[in-house]
Amino acid sequence: MTETPRDNSATRARWQTCLKLARELLLVGPDDKDLKLSYLHTLIDTGRLGPTHHPRKKILVIGAGITGLVAGRLLKDAGYDVTIIEANESRVGGRIKTFRATKHHQPFDDAAQYAEAGAMRLPDFHPLVLALVDKLGLGRRQFYNVDVGPSTGSGPEVPVPPVTYTSFTGQTWTNGDDSPDFREPDKRGNSWIRANRVQVRRADYTASPERINEGFHLTGDEVRAPVVKMVDDALESVRDYYSDVVDGKRVNKPFDEWVEGWARVIRDFDGYSMGGFLRDHAGLSDEAIEAVGTLENTSSRLHLSFFHSFLSRSDINPTVRYWEIPGGSWRLPHALHEGLRDEVRLGHRMIRLEYHDPSRDADPEGTAVGPDGWGVTVETVAENDPQAPPRRWTADLAIVTIPFSALRFVEIVPSMSYKKRRAIVETHYDSATKVLLEFSHRWWEFTEDDWREELERIAPGVYEYYRLGPEAAGEPARMPTLAEADAGLLGAAVKDSGVTEEMRQIGSTMPLRGPALRPATHSFGGGSATDNPNRFMYYPSHRVEGSTGGVVLASYSWSDDAARWDSMRSAERYVYALRNLQALHGRRIEVFFTGRGATKSWARDPYAFGEAAIYTAHQMTSFHLDASRPEGPVHFAGEHTSLKHAWIEGALEVHTA
């Protein structure tokens, strides 16, 4: 650990930046108050902003994602004249999107099925979003990041526990009644890890990681450690900056040391990528870093900021409890939209933003703003009518919630400050792509007896056909291609299969690699990891009532891994995702494939322009503090202006601020 920086102007300025960033990250406000408690009071306890002595203002909110909707709701309830402009003509919610049946579209064969294109899990330590879900009466149930025992836990009839937040001030905020009978299901680890042609269950890897690790040519102590332990051990020296180990548990240092410790973490490590940190600071071998990247799904993000991965270690790990919204995450923005029907204007894309900045000597010629006029003018074009003339909107001030990656294509007059322009131009937005496949039966939950029973329902001998197929012990085996299968087994168990001729043609060129038969997965929720292009897969945590099937997140990939999928047509994605799913689960899963799926590339989304803001090295200290700084009457909010990138909680924190 390094000490306070030497006393010169450059290091003093950098140290002050790091202190400000630490206080923002920890939500430490003026007078060392906990801002999270203030946000919970505003958003949940009262649902209203504090009293204002300003005259009623006209406010434009740009973007009807979660930030724009909540900001609009609070401002409307406070008596302001609010208009929310959204480019998407068909929906609100931004990167909260659920594939589901509507009156215009049905993505899956079973109209009851749904799956998430975007946000899918809400961690226990994000109290703002969880309490908002409860306040809106949407309900919540557990999302199983690790598969569980189906007959364990307290069951759906027992109420979920209340949302609780313990502040660094010692105060505890809670929302709702205790649920003393609530019990989490037992974690099992039946899902798979497959890398370098070796496949084991997650529980077996945790107990004995050598088989998988040897495939990465690890030796010595590294070969005997699960990758999650390698990373956690590597991060212990960083945690020492702001916490101590007391009786085997991490405890924050006294307040001033805690805040300054985080500031030192930012100062010392913002210049690292995650790969650089593991190699140059933690001393992991290149082989160990490759294993970490593959099994923790971070290979494609090793070049990005250390800080993002460091914070994510708390966000996505097996020990955290997660929640989901029954019926889909779309219900959250939809519930907010219900109270803003008159304020939201869909189908209007902002192309020009003019604003009056009182700190400047004069306004540019030809603008419609000024000291005696409106503070902001926005020009939009209609998404559903390219021939329509642009429309002009005026207001006293604007709150811009769209991603900087989208704002980059808006003409802004006058030019904003240099640091703001840097933030808009340079903020790195990563890619994320999902490929979801629908199956008529929940084969991932099957035992081997279930497999026998269900396959024999299709036709006598189908179970034996798969069981006795050619095996590949060391060398790739070629099962009959889809075109050669006598029974046409792709989708064989599905009435009115949606498998298209295009899918069959693509599949006919892709023989299955590896054994045709795999052990029954018998996994309830959770997910598997692989080094094939699918990377991470997730099984549904809960059945859809009245449905025998489900939708599997067959591929969830980021960054360069996602870009490979983005080059394919949808039909190609479905067939490749199915083949790679079969590599882990055996060929026989094909009989339940309905031929229907859904896929989403956030990098190719014309409104999102990327999955989320994820900094590269140095970006946080270079311009993050300028990301949310107002430019005259123009304010900025969204997950990209928080330090909880890619999470709904971050979007809620900055809008409330």
Curated annotation (Swiss-Prot):
Record: residues binding FAD: E86, A87, R95, M120, R121, M350, E639, W647, I648
Species for this entry: Streptomyces diastatochromogenes
Site (Important for substrate specificity): R301
EC code: 1.4.3.11
Lineage, broadest ranks: Bacteria, Bacillati, Actinomycetota, Actinomycetes, Kitasatosporales
Name of the molecule in the record: L-glutamate oxidase precursor
GO CC annotation terms, alphabetical: extracellular region
Pfam family, any one: Amino_oxidase
InterPro entries: Amino_oxidase, FAD/NAD-bd_sf, Flavin_monoamine_oxidase
Flavoprotein found in the keyword field: yes
Gene: lgoX
